[in-house]
Regions:
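Bacterial N-terminal signal peptides that target proteins for export
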Residues: 1-9
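Bacterial N-terminal signal peptides
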Residues: 8-18
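Primarily secretory-pathway and cell-envelope proteins
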Residues: 20-65, 99-190
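Tryptophan-paired
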Residues: 61-82
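Short Pro-Gly-centered beta-turn/loop motif in secreted/extracellular proteins
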Residues: 75-89, 94-96
Length: 190
């Protein structure tokens, strides 16, 4: 009977731990559409600008994901990969020297949405080191730099998919720049 209880407890603990597993994600390397099911997935584009050496960033949704494979361009790390649609929150920044920073899970300023069949720009996570091991965090909108990254690294995907800003606040920069044939600024000056 004791052996049966031990095996049952081991099975329950194994199931619990496997449900808490963090799924590692990698930035796509090739400039071709990697969405397996476009009705259920969208691309995440996230920039990280920091003076702290980070090893990974964790996201929480229905599942937990870790981003640890970045592409460097214009003094920023970028992460670009398909994710299931839904609401995501940045939860943890892991550092190279075995430390980490936990972010406030309830703070909407660290949240963004992944809409299906689109490139979803979540923003630029800015991390600045403070004194005594502290740091400050912001998720800001740098859409023009994100567009430069997509044009340089993923022009084919950019030509196939709509890009939308999904970070804190509202911004229609991508809609104005990518979906117009002429500049509304130039037209108004004439």
């Amino acid at each position: 009977m004791k052996l049966y209880l031990s095996y049952s407890l081991l099975l329950v603990m194994s199931l619990f731990l496997s449900s808490c597993a963090i799924v590692p994600l990698k930035t796509i390397k090739e400039d071709k559409n990697a969405l397996k099911n476009s009705a259920e997935q969208g691309y995440l584009l996230l920039a990280i600008n920091t003076d702290v050496r980070i090893s990974s960033v964790e996201l929480k949704s229905d599942s937990s994901f870790t981003l640890n494979d970045f592409v460097w361009l214009n003094d920023r790390n970028y992460f670009f990969a398909p994710l299931p649609k839904g609401q995501y929150t940045l939860t943890k920044i892991n550092l190279f020297y075995n430390g980490y920073y936990e972010l406030d899970f309830d703070d909407v300023s660290f949240s963004f949405n992944i809409a299906p069949n689109q490139i979803n720009y979540g923003g630029e996570l800015r991390i600045k080191r403070g004194y005594g091991g502290s740091a400050s965090f912001e998720l800001i909108n740098r859409s023009s730099l994100a567009l430069e990254f997509l044009e340089a690294k993923y022009p084919n995907i950019l030509s196939e998919k709509q890009v939308i800003y999904q970070g804190p606040g509202n911004d229609d920069f991508f809609g104005l720049v990518l979906n117009s044939t002429s500049s509304p600024i130039l037209e108004s000056e004439q």
